Amino acid sequence: MAIYEVKHPLIQHKLGLLRKADLSTKQFRELASEVARLLTYEATKDLETESITINGWAGPVTVQQIKGKKITIVPILRAGLGMMNGVLDMIPSAKVSVVGLYRNEETLEPVAYYEKFTTDMEERTALIIDPMLATGGSLLATIEMLKATGCRRIKGLFLVAVPEGLEKISSAHPDVEIYVASIDERLNEHGYILPGLGDAGDKIFGTK
């Protein structure tokens, strides 16, 4: 599995701001969206393009456009929604598919409660978005749902991840690419990332 820890200075600066404990909901949302936008730029650098001819201001001109059915964004509810606008800023024509999962706080395993995928999934590149890749359980479940639709080109975009989760995904799905702003140290006894960002869902939605 290809794992890209994106070390761009803008990403690292904004991630540092995200780690501050006293951010307002508005500030956290804005920064999460900005980092998602930059990760999208990295994750789409290998998309295929094709030549088309359009009418330019001085006559016909040949330009490049992304080839095929393009992209579906797959936010994992609920925290993944906090990254969605940033991705859509870069790919405004992308279709949005949704996966609803919550974590059982005793077993730390994901429980699925909702899924809705766009059409022609087998022809699309899926960009899974979620602020955290912790145990890897939610991502694993989402990948399996996507592959059940026929989707085979899958990438994940995360603000932070830990080696434990990355190893789980690498073992089960070596064909999936991961783009992450930071590979953090470890999980604590409650399954939260350290140093991490805290509870990203609560920070994005202003809940506790």
UniProtKB/Swiss-Prot annotation:
Covalent S-S links between cysteines: none
Pfam families in alphabetical order: UPRTase
Binding sites annotated in the UniProt record for uracil: 193, 198-200
InterPro entries: PRibTrfase_dom, PRTase-like, Upp_B, UPRTase/APRTase, Ura_phspho_trans
EC number: 2.4.2.9
Functional note: Catalyzes the conversion of uracil and 5-phospho-alpha-D-ribose 1-diphosphate (PRPP) to UMP and diphosphate.
Protein name (record): Uracil phosphoribosyltransferase
